[in-house]
Structure formats: C-alpha cells, structure tokens
Amino acid sequence: MLKKCLPLLLLCTAPVFAKPVLTVYTYDSFAADWGPGPVVKKAFEADCNCELKLVALEDGVSLLNRLRMEGKNSKADVVLGLDNNLLDAASKTGLFAKSGVAADAVNVPGGWNNDTFVPFDYGYFAFVYDKNKLKNPPQSLKELVESDQNWRVIYQDPRTSTPGLGLLLWMQKVYGDDAPQAWQKLAKKTVTVTKGWSEAYGLFLKGESDLVLSYTTSPAYHILEEKKDNYAAANFSEGHYLQVEVAARTAASKQPELAQKFLQFMVSPAFQNAIPTGNWMYPVANVTLPAGFEKLTKPATTLEFTPAEVAAQRQAWISEWQRAVSR
C-alpha cells in the first residue's frame, strides 16, 4: 500500500519545492548570449530563489504590440525594452502596475518622475560608419539626407523598432513639416528598412551599407571587445535624439512581488554593471564606465519630444513616412 501511495505523495509535494518563474519579455539583443541577459539572469537567480525566463522579441515597439495583442492574458510579468517615446501609449493600455521604485534611484538626462516605468539604460541615436571605408561622413542629419553623395543607409522600421521610431522623431525635430520630403530623399539612399536593430547592424557589418542607425555608444563594442577603433558614430550638428529604455511590471502578473523585486534589482550595481559592456548603453546608476567610453561621440545637443507629444503625433508621422518612402 505504501509503495502505491508514494508516487502520488511525490506528485502532491513536488510543486511545493518548484521554484517560481518570473517571465520577462524583452528584445532579442538583450536576451542574446552576447547581450546582458545571461549575466542578469545569473545574478537575479542567485538572489531570488526563482527562475528568470527571458522571452525575446524583435525590438521594443514589438514588445508593446505583443502585449496589446495578449492583453490581460499575457504571460509576461515584466516587460523590459520599451522607451521614453512609448510611455504614453504603454500607459494608456492599462496593462502595467506601479513599480514601487523610487524615482531618485535612477539618473537620466532631464530627470525622471514616472512611478510605473523604470529606466534601466539610456543612449543617443546615431549613424555608425567604418572610418576605413567612409572618409568624409555626414556632419549633420540634413547633410545625410540632402547631400549628392551616394551613401548607402540602413535603418529600422518605426512600426516595430524603437531606434526606427527614434529616427522618425529625430527627422521630425529637424525637418518639422518638411519631413515627408526629407524621407523621400533618404529613401533614394536606403538599402533596406529592417524590423529590428540586430538585423540592421548585422547587415552593416557585412558591408551592405555605409551607415546604419544605431547609437553613439555602439563603437564601444568594437573598441573593447574587438580592439578595433575603425567604427565611429557620426556627430550631427543639429544634435542627437535621446532614448531612455524602461521596464515595467504587468498588472496581471502572477508573480507581483517577484516582479517588483526584479525592478528594484534592475537599478542595482549587479544589473547596471552589465549595461555598458552588455547592452552598450549608458547605465542609469552610478557605476564606473569602462575605459573606451571616453572616446565616444558626445552630443552637444539633446533632442526629445515629450511622451504626450509622441503619443499625439506618432501614428500620423508614421503614415507620412509610409507614404513618402513608397513613392
């Protein structure tokens, strides 16, 4: 009788010892073997007595699209990889809960006062090029767009990618009502528009373009990991558009306490030290930057719309872009 009951007893008691799983939706380059994801996973699991499950999607806008589709049935406990340009749209979904993280725990340009979304890094959009191949890079966004130079350009889709959305807003800041004409000119130099950052940067490294939309911090990877200094970010006279990447916990999470603990962990040194050489962005906490970051392009001017401005105009500007590049 005891032998018959033993398997049943084990089945009944096994869940008691199973570790809880915290599911984090993020973008592919964060979760990749070469991204900060593995380091973050190891550090958090060492402290939480849980399993951290990273679910990778193509890019930041795709995260919001996926969450909208899944709604309250989403398996995500935390969404990591939205940004300052999606704050208003993300808030209006009603799918996120307050973070419990103090605003003064983070340090980003312009400050931070949102009680739902927590920054984990920041950076500036830029066009990266190979100095060995491009001797006279554009000195401004207008030069990139309007020059007679036959530069080959790759950027990301603003409907699926946060860098792509960043370029959309950057163009709008510089050109205003003339943005559609600027997009038409840039289209003549555009090799392709990708869904996400990883694909675009990979094509650039294969020699498919002269310039690729990325970040002022991207050359740090080549400097530190490859010991190469031939990649640089073009420094544009109009300034560079700021991106602050954020995470938030979902209101429907089955692990609300773990999700809140993860957000607190996100602004700690254990997470933040993985950002400069894992995500190749600037950390939001006071951690030491590695040697090599001092060589990076430093924008003289920071460009940014408010989240409300982006929310009010984003769809209209995307429609303008679609019409312009399809002509």
UniProtKB/Swiss-Prot annotation:
GO cellular component: ATP-binding cassette (ABC) transporter complex, substrate-binding subunit-containing; membrane; outer membrane-bounded periplasmic space
Keyword set, alphabetical order: Periplasm, Signal, Transport
Keyword Transmembrane helix among record annotations: no
Source species, domain of life: Bacteria
A Pfam family that the UniProt record links to this protein: SBP_bac_1
Signal peptide: 1-18
One GO-annotated biological process of the protein: thiamine transport
Residue ranges the record marks as coiled coil: none
InterPro entries registered for this protein in UniProt: SBP, SBP_1_CS, ThiB, ThiB-like
Regulation: Transport is inhibited by the sulfhydryl-specific modifier N-ethylmaleimide.
Residues given in the record as thiamine binding sites: 59-60, 161-162, 197, 215-218
Predominant localisation class: periplasm
Subcellular locations according to the entry: Periplasm
GO MF, one annotated term: thiamine binding
Annotated family: Belongs to the bacterial solute-binding protein 1 family.
Quaternary structure (record): Monomer in solution. The complex is composed of two ATP-binding proteins (ThiQ), two transmembrane proteins (ThiP) and a solute-binding protein (ThiB).
Protein name as annotated: Thiamine-binding periplasmic protein
Gene of this entry: thiB
